[in-house]
Amino acid sequence: METRERDLERLIPMHKSGASPRDVVLSVPPSPLASPIHVAGKEAIYKVIRSWASKKFMTGCVILLPIAVTFYFTWWFIHFVDGFFSPIYTHLGINMFGLGFVTSITFIFMVGVFMSSWLGASVLSIGEWFIKKMPLVSYIYSASKQISGAISPDQSSGAFKEVAIIRHPHMGEYAFGFITSTVILRGRAGGEELCCVYVPTNHLYLGDIFLISSKDIIRPNLSVREGIEIVISGGMSIPHMLTTLDSETIHRMLESFGILEFGDVCLSLVLAWT
């Protein structure tokens, strides 16, 4: 052992601080050629792990987000509807979650059954007559009724009669809309049938008014419910291919709504808002 120490003293000079030859040998820095490769390997492994973890995390968010949103709004809706009748049951000493919700759903169903009868329609007509006599309430009720009529199961009375595609806001760009009604424009040349086309945002209300010829209106093979789905989903539920309706199909659809009485040119009232 002493012989090895003497050999090290001859090969390596002693440090001024009095460090032993063994400490001097151990304190020699590593080779500069191996360090960058080692660091680059660590960085590459770190980037791969980070990319993999990021992709898996985003995949989990994409899967769980619609589920969480659905459960949240469903839970909120149940609590909201349950709040109508639950105070009555609480006052009676009955504390059971969901009982108010079941009662509310049953009440809505019974109202639908009653209003479908002749007696219910008569009562509704009398109630609407009183509401229309009120200055401010009549406007709110009329607007709300038109919006609710868009999703009415009775398509003959629905506000949205068929889906339309128009060139808006520039040539080469198209927007979805709904034909809501028809009007007649009378002039010196005679009467022209004009179509009201409503182009909503995903909120389905408010907008600007544009006048567009019916020749620029494209009628796709989509139902009103499918059109509403496309608008609400931001275009994500749109089919990969759209086909336009032929003239005979359009003629039959217009006849079913009773709006074929005048000419071929339509005025499109396009309601859109930014």
Curated annotation (Swiss-Prot):
Membrane keyword on record: yes
Transmembrane feature ranges: 61-81, 94-114
InterPro entries, sorted: COV1-like
Cell compartment(s), UniProt: Membrane
Main subcellular localisation: membrane
Membrane topology, record value: Multi-pass membrane protein
Topology, Extracellular side: 82-93
Residue ranges, Cytoplasmic side: 1-60, 115-274
Keywords: Membrane, Transmembrane, Transmembrane helix
GO cellular component, one term: membrane
Assigned protein family: Belongs to the plant COV1 protein family.
This protein's name: Protein LIKE COV 3
Organism: Arabidopsis thaliana
Organism classification: Eukaryota, Viridiplantae, Streptophyta, Embryophyta, Tracheophyta
Gene that encodes it: LCV3
